[in-house]
Amino acid sequence: MKRLAAVLLLLAATASAQQTLIRTQKPPLHGSHWMAVTGKPLAATAGAMIFQKGGNAVDAAAAMIAATCTMWDTLSWGGETQALIYDPHTKKVTGINALGVAPTGATPEFYKGKGFTHPPDEGVLAAVTPGTPGGIMTMVAEYGRLSLKDVLAPAIEMADGYALEAQSANTMDRNKEKLKNWPYSKKVFLIHDDNPKHPGPVAGEIFRQPDLAATLRKLVEAEQQALKKGKSRKEAIYAAYDRFYKGDIAREIVRGTREQGGLFTEEDLANWKVHIEEPVTTTYKGIDVYKLNVWTQGPAMLQALNILENFDLKGMSFNSPRYINTVYQAMSLAWADRDFYYGDTYAPPEEPVLGLLSKDYAKERAKLINPDHNDPKIKPGDPYPYQRGVNPFPDLLRNWDTSKPPASKPGGTQDSGLRNEFLRATPSLSNDYLFAFYSGTTSVEAADAEGWAVSVTPSGGWLPAVIAGNSGVGLSERMQSFVLDPSEGPYNVVAPGKHPRVTLTPTLALKDGLPWLVFSVQGGDSQDQNLLQFFLDVVEFGMTVQEATEAPNINSFQMHSSFGGHDIKPGNILLNSSEPPWVRGELRRMGYTMTFEDRTSGPINAIMIDRPHGTFWGGSSNHGEDYGIGW
């Protein structure tokens, strides 16, 4: 009898294990020394190589960014980098703002004079100054352990030639007609003149970028020359930084940009700098959640958490109609504030950050959530009284209209779809919607046993990118996130030297004062929507990081798009195709216009630090090429 009982227990345990194994399409990643998770297998390998060289999580993250920049379909070297770093020595979380700024001459009048109602979403006039090179070098100089030569070695080897992956090859092929318009891009990407139908490289072909390789070697050369002169490791890396932004590399970027009709000046690059800054934070169920400031959309997730703290989400059950309705409206409230109040914190007017993140303000906003019906006309609130201030834009706030999209952009390309990271919901989503989850932006997560933890959301310069002369550097397309009219966002109106308000949003969470979760995602306006739900899946519903990356999400289109024509579709919701009929019926009754897809999230990547066991859990998206390596 005892033997039978033992057999039954063993069978039950085996069945339980099998159920656990089939809960996710990908297994969770485990490690005890270090972990690197990102959107490209080769980039994850670059991170692993740096760890094996003795680098820390910051070095590994920088190498992953550099490698991904060399592969083009999600970002390139002229884009922007945003990071959160936990330093185990200071026990502080620090933010890295390596976002470019609008160049000289980029004014509302300039773009309106060319017939635009918003800055363009591609081409040379869509470019802000390059930020990622400065971001990588600052991260390594201030928080890394290795030389720039070590950190850039994988990217340089790739620029010399690597076996092109299918996704990048397909992206080049899709954009071949546009790449023909820009001579330096054509030289790099359309290398087979004898095959006009498919002039780009194919999957498996060795893809070489000699101009980019030369530029990266110039950075290493500047570092090594400084070291020979007796400079410190940090000083030598900043010598490379100066060569990029103030030396011959900068001059070629400016020359190549202006030759193709761009606005960059040498002063634009020389005056730009990386900001090392204090992030913003809130608490949820005793967990400290950190985001970059309101020059990103990241604080909208914190606002949503503050609102949702007033509800029993676990009691509603996962993805029930009541839960979906509550989360949707909380996001709508937070993103309405994002659309109105968020902007560059280094340029006037000053944003009401304290009021926006006030718990009392969140309680008042939470009262607006209707448990029975969605409100498609949710408007921004007024956070100023919660920081003892007076709203400087009362008329714009009073007249804010969420019921209709802005006018179409004359002469623009807002409907081409492939550059937009998050497209408008339609009754039948096109393939462009699915491409949008793959194109533009990646996420980079790294952690090590020493205690370093890093979350990065680099982006910009994705295909079809304009390459700046013979530098090999592709230009960003981030100007499109500005507005030209204060009525569409008084804090985010374009001006020379100003950062656009971006969607890019790394996340770092502490438990008991120590790193617990690092996570981020690509997907434009959906980024913090999906990260919010990932976080709730882990905290409220006890999912592992792999389960939470694969869990079905909802996406709202009730906020203004940060891309193209800045469209808005109140009441539109994207749901997973697995939602049962009774859930669909309830949401229809609540006033939602529903669209369904098998994929409802950009690729979330995450690392959880398991302190009781001294190990790491990694999660990477089951869609696309996202990949992790741990040891």
Positions of the model-derived regions?
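Internal maturation/activation junctions in enzymes
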Residues: L313-W452, V456-S459, D598
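Amphipathic alpha-helical
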Residues: Y238-N271, E364-R398, L463
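Extended C-terminal subregions enriched in glycine
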Residues: E450, G497-P500, L531-L532, E540-R599
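Short, well-structured alpha-helical segments that form the helix of a local strand-helix-strand
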Residues: V58-M64, K149-D160, F244-G247, E252-V254, ...
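Positively charged n-region of N-terminal signal peptides that target proteins for export
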Residues: M1-L4
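Hydrophobic h-region of N-terminal signal peptides that target proteins for export
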Residues: L9-A17
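Noncatalytic scaffold domains of N-terminal-nucleophile
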Residues: Q18-T45, M49, N56-A239, F244-T296
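Active-site rim segments in enzyme catalytic domains, especially the processed small/beta chain
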Residues: T70-G95, K112, R255, Q260-T265, ...
